[in-house]
């Protein structure tokens, strides 16, 4: 399992942003990230300066949204849907996207379910409950 550090994630998004701005060739993963970066222009400043990005504190106490976490969740959901893992996520996602008339809105709803699943797992010390996650998405669809 690939487990990048916080700095690795921030470097990845900043480098993707830089390459996009310079119109350089992107890796397949960077191309997916670029698509989500373009849908969140409000975060462009966060990705434009690697040193500032590495030093930034997005803790809950500061009340600012974490653009790196947000985009990471978009990437995670896109990957889950592409391989239908956990099983059923693709169908639940498609149903939700149809209901909301858009993939982006569906991603944001799924983020709530994904965040809740991860929080529950951390709180309980148990593995993430994929079935509960899918049920959450299906309820929103």
Residue locations for each model-derived region?
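Core of compact, soluble alpha-helical bundle domains
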Residues: 2-65
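Glycine-rich, aromatic-bearing surface loops/beta-hairpins
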Residues: 116-141
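Alpha-helix N-cap/helix-initiation sites
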Residues: 6, 23-27, 70, 86, ...
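Short alpha-helical scaffolding segments that buttress acidic/His motifs in well-ordered protein cores
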Residues: 13, 33, 37, 72-77, ...
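A short structural micro-motif
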Residues: 36, 53-54, 99, 113-120, ...
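Short coil/turn segments at secondary-structure boundaries
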Residues: 26-30, 46-50, 88-94, 108-111, ...
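Heme-based O2/NO sensor domains and their adjacent alpha-helical segments
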Residues: 39, 43-98
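Short, mixed-charge aromatic SLiMs
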Residues: 96-106, 134-141
